[in-house]
Amino acid sequence: MIHIGQLDLEKKAAVVAVILEKSLEISRKAAKMGADLLEIRLDLLGIRDLETAAETIRKVKSETGLPVILTNRSITEGGKWEGKEADRIELLTNLISLKDGPDAVDIELSAGREARDQVIKAAKAHGKTVIVSSHDFSRTPAFQEMKTILEEAFLAGADIAKLAVMPQSRRDVLNLLRVALDAREAGNAVCTIAMGRLGKHTRVIAPFYGSVLTYAAVNSEVSAAPGQFQVDEVKKILELLE
């Protein structure tokens, strides 16, 4: 069973609200909008110390009752973390080791193997779900290359392999959906996203091709990636299509 906290992802895809500002206020709003999960983006929130991060996660979980994905995205993968890589990894590792810490952690496939393994080992030891992610903001890799990326994520220890790409054509989008479907039919949990205008519809379509997570914004003016709908919009469209 694939789950994050007590949320069973085998039943249906979860809508993840990306928290990138005013953490407690926006988290409450996301919960009211119907979010299933919260992604706490430490890099976008500007949180760099363990105490503040731990308190933020504790309050958000207590106030909303929703499971939390912890992300501290590197600049090379589209994030805003500007500190040392060792500090980024240490912060992730320490937070996922806390009893009342996050329920899942996102670590990039591109992170150095030693650093990536450190985060994954800590997560597994504390029963936390591991998301191994890969982001390409300039293109969509070829079909077989995308399959290989997901395979490498699972070999690295992913419970969920996440792949976000920038399509240049409708064919790119179709290939991504094919990759998601193949992975799901093979029994693997994936999250696949085509960003930007061409891929915007995948945020509500990909769940029907095997994607177990779809990310959404809480405020329309502020989003973490191009093409994100708002949480309530995604929930409504998914309900109409189910």
From Swiss-Prot:
Assigned EC number: 4.2.1.10
Binding site residues for 3-dehydroquinate: 39-41, 73, 203, 228
Pathway noted in the entry: Metabolic intermediate biosynthesis; chorismate biosynthesis; chorismate from D-erythrose 4-phosphate and phosphoenolpyruvate: step 3/7
Enzyme class (EC, first level): lyase
Active site: 135, 162
Full protein name: 3-dehydroquinate dehydratase
Keyword Hydrolase: no
Superkingdom per UniProt: Archaea
Single biological process term from Gene Ontology: amino acid biosynthetic process
A GO MF term: 3-dehydroquinate dehydratase activity
Gene: aroD
Keywords: Amino-acid biosynthesis, Aromatic amino acid biosynthesis, Lyase, Schiff base
Function in brief: Involved in the third step of the chorismate pathway, which leads to the biosynthesis of aromatic amino acids. Catalyzes the cis-dehydration of 3-dehydroquinate (DHQ) and introduces the first double bond of the aromatic ring to yield 3-dehydroshikimate.
Family: Belongs to the type-I 3-dehydroquinase family.
Complex formation: Homodimer.
Catalytic reaction annotation: 3-dehydroquinate = 3-dehydroshikimate + H2O
Chaperone as UniProt keyword: no
